[in-house]
Amino acid sequence: MVFEGHLVGTGLKVGVVVGRFNEFITSKLLGGALDGLKRHGVEEADIDVAWVPGAFEIPLIAKKMANSGKYDAVITLGTVIRGATTHYDYVCNEVAKGVASLSLQTDIPVIFGVLTTETIEQAIERAGTKAGNKGYESAVAAIEMAHLSKQWA
């Protein structure tokens, strides 16, 4: 037997957690995610968005959303751009681990849409220019995973 999630979001409730740091990028990721959700049938009234200060704060609010029982999936969006210190490495590692563990802890799909880039240019490319929009891609993944995970509910 083959299991697949379909890409029709009608009736799904989705939470989105967005890091405010590097907002000129994260706002474009959010725009892409909202566009992706709506284009696939998720009603605007069924989408909740929570802004947090930065990427490091994303896992806590994503966990609270996932544990609330209100959402079929949670999308996490943020942007971490390498600077001159090791801060980038710590933030990227902790955010990735935190978000990755949430699906296992909560049984709700939590999608990792946090950009971790070497340069501002790379982040811009992934927020709606030549490399697509990772927010949109995260929305599609959330819809697919919400349906797929319900097959074992």
Curated annotation (Swiss-Prot):
Domain of life: Bacteria
Binding of (2S)-2-hydroxy-3-oxobutyl phosphate, residues: A84, T85, R126
MF term (GO), any: 6,7-dimethyl-8-ribityllumazine synthase activity
Physiological role: Catalyzes the formation of 6,7-dimethyl-8-ribityllumazine by condensation of 5-amino-6-(D-ribitylamino)uracil with 3,4-dihydroxy-2-butanone 4-phosphate. This is the penultimate step in the biosynthesis of riboflavin.
Keyword Metal-binding on entry: no
The EC number(s) this enzyme carries: 2.5.1.78
Catalysed reactions, semicolon-separated: (2S)-2-hydroxy-3-oxobutyl phosphate + 5-amino-6-(D-ribitylamino)uracil = 6,7-dimethyl-8-(1-D-ribityl)lumazine + phosphate + 2 H2O + H(+)
Name of the protein in its database record: 6,7-dimethyl-8-ribityllumazine synthase
